[in-house]
Amino acid sequence: KCYSYYTYQCDSLMAFPNGDKLWDSFLTEAIGKGLKGRQLRNAIPHRRMTATIYKNYPQGKITVTDFLLGQYYLYEDALNSQEWNIESDSMKVVLGHECQKATCSFRGRKWTAWFALDVPISDGPLKFCGLPGLIMEVYDRGKQYYFCINGMQQVSATPITFGNLDKDFKHFQKINRKDFLISKYR
């Protein structure tokens, strides 16, 4: 499951019994400081990325949920590993792990990833996967999209299973990826 830290922060705030009142107090404080526009928006908890991505490796698919104009949407996409070019001579440390560089073209962009061989999980943020270690950092050529791990911990939580999610997805409108993206970027 992949989702934004800010989404987690906002959802956690709203999970409190008085979460909406706390949110209102953050907004009132920011307005009181004279913040406007982007500064005001960044001063209060809000979602920056509305999509949540569920990777179903056994079925080879990705389920994406997203929110647009008051409606929740769900679409499925193929879980395809990118065709990575691993550069064995390029190394860098990310979060205390020595990482190796890999590059690929994916959905019209050139991407650079740094993956940790000492974390043998072939996964990463968003739809990125297929390297022989956890993708710790990935970005496109212009760094318009940039994802970097900021922490890692092992938890003993109940695994995410799609059987449980099916009932949660009942209020989502099913759509295909292309139609969703056309609606989103219209």
Task: Label every model-predicted segment.
Residues 94-95, 106:
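Structural motif
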